[in-house]
Amino acid sequence: MNRNTLDFIQSCIATIPDYPKPGIIFRDVTSLVEHPQGFHQTIELLKEHYQSMSFDKVVGTEARGFIFGAPLAYALQLGFIPVRKPGKLPRSVLEQSYQLEYGEDCLQMHCDAIKPGEKVLVVDDLLATGGTVEATIKMIREAGGIVEHAAFVISLPDLGGEERLTAMGVNVLKLVDFPGH
């Protein structure tokens, strides 16, 4: 990947200190999608990286995974599957719980969205601890899908998400790293 393009993408991501609480440094990916060239270059880099690989579907996690997953699916001429919070999908769903810092949350996916044996690329905006994407991968695998790749715009490497997903047999692509929390 072109280092200048990656640096440009990183420069489009705003850093907000003390949000949502004191001591947290928030990486605001919405500033990237507000920037037409930054957003375009992000999707182009992801497309260039994955276009020679074989996938049947792209899955994006709620909500910012939709922002990057849907245009990437379009660029790769693949279907897009949204993974949502409970109560947002109208048909029969698979469900997977995952741990938060203070409690538990849940994700859902339509039962019929992925057929057994389909190869799936998972996309999200940010990789921190990896809990959300781990839950997503478990659902895809429960449906019989094959997940070997996950893509992220931002990674917070100090939080261990890449190691968590690698332990599941998933190759992780991240465009930019921001050290710290």
From Swiss-Prot:
Q: According to the UniProt entry, where is the signal peptide? A: none
Q: Biological process GO annotation list?
A: adenine salvage; AMP salvage; purine ribonucleoside salvage
* EC number(s) on file: 2.4.2.7
Cite the CDD domains for this sequence: PRTases_typeI
Pathway(s) the chain acts in:
Purine metabolism; AMP biosynthesis via salvage pathway; AMP from adenine: step 1/1
Which GO CC terms are listed, alphabetically?
A: cytosol
Listed InterPro entries: Ade_phspho_trans, Adenine_PRTase, PRibTrfase_dom, PRTase-like
Q: Which top-level enzyme class is recorded in the Swiss-Prot or TrEMBL entry?
A: transferase
What's the stated role of this polypeptide? Catalyzes a salvage reaction resulting in the formation of AMP, that is energically less costly than de novo synthesis.
Q: How does it assemble?
A: Homodimer.
Protein name (Swiss-Prot/TrEMBL) = Adenine phosphoribosyltransferase
State the organism named in the record.
Tolumonas auensis (strain DSM 9187 / NBRC 110442 / TA 4)
